[in-house]
Design a protein with these regions (language model features):
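N-terminal cap/leader regions of alpha/beta-hydrolase-fold enzymes
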Residues: 1-193
Length: 193
C-alpha cells in the first residue's frame, strides 16, 4: 500500500503499531494475531505513535498540511479514531474498520462514540457480507455523522465481505479492491492531498 501511494507522489509511512506488544511475523493465522497482539494495543498508544509518525514525516520533507490516513480492518477503526484525534488531518479512508464495540481500558471509545470529535472527512469502504461489521452499524454511523454535520461518504459493496482488499487472503475481491483504491485516490485528491 505504501509503495502504491508513493507511486502517486505521496510520502507514505506504515508505522509498526504493534512493536511493543509483539511481532506478528511468527504467528500463522489472523485470529491468533488479533488475540495475542492486537488486543493488547491501547488506542492512546496508537494515537501517540501516529502523531509521532506525522511529526517525523513533517521533519523529513512531508507536508504536514496534507496529512491523511488510511487503514484496513483494525487500521480502519484507527482511521476513524485518528480523524477525531488529529486536528488538521485532511482526509481519511477507512477500509472495513469496526465502528462499534464494548469500551475497555485499552479501547475506551469506538468510532460511533467519537462522531462529534471527527474533524476530517472520511470515506468508509465496507462489504455487505462482512460477518463482523453489520451493514446496520454502517447505517448507524452514516446517520450519526449526518446528524452531526460531518463530511463522510460510505460505499458498501454488495458482494464483498471483510478484507476484500487483502490480495493474499481468500476474501480478496479484485473488482471491489480496485474500485476502492480508485475511490481512495479520488477522495485524497478531492480533499487537497
Amino acid at each position: 500500500v505504501c509503495r502504491r501511494l508513493a507511486r502517486q507522489g505521496y510520502q507514505a509511512i506504515a508505522p509498526n503499531l504493534y512493536q511493543r506488544q509483539g511481532d506478528p511475523a511468527g504467528i500463522e493465522n489472523v485470529p491468533d494475531i488479533l488475540a495475542k497482539i492486537v488486543s493488547k494495543v491501547a488506542d492512546a498508544q496508537v494515537m501517540s505513535d501516529l502523531d509521532t509518525a506525522a511529526a517525523w514525516a513533517a521533519a523529513h520533507g512531508g507536508d504536514a498540511s496534507r496529512l491523511g490516513i488510511t487503514g484496513f480492518c483494525w487500521g480502519g477503526r484507527i482511521t476513524w479514531l485518528y480523524a477525531a484525534h488529529k486536528p488538521g488531518l485532511r482526509a481519511g479512508v477507512a477500509w472495513y474498520g469496526r465502528l462499534t464495540g464494548v469500551a475497555s481500558p485499552l479501547t475506551p471509545a469506538h468510532p460511533i462514540d467519537v462522531v462529534a470529535q471527527i474533524t476530517a472527512p472520511v470515506l468508509g469502504l465496507y462489504g455487505a457480507k462482512d460477518q463482523g461489521i453489520p451493514v446496520s452499524d454502517v447505517d448507524d454511523m452514516r446517520s450519526d455523522l449526518l446528524k452531526a454535520g460531518k463530511r463522510a461518504e460510505f460505499v458498501v459493496y454488495p458482494e464483498a465481505g471483510h478484507a476484500f482488499h487483502a490480495d493474499y487472503r481468500p476474501s480478496y475481491r479484485a473488482a471491489e479492491a480496485a474500485d476502492g483504491w480508485g475511490r481512495l485516490l479520488a477522495w485524497f485528491k478531492a480533499n487537497g492531498m
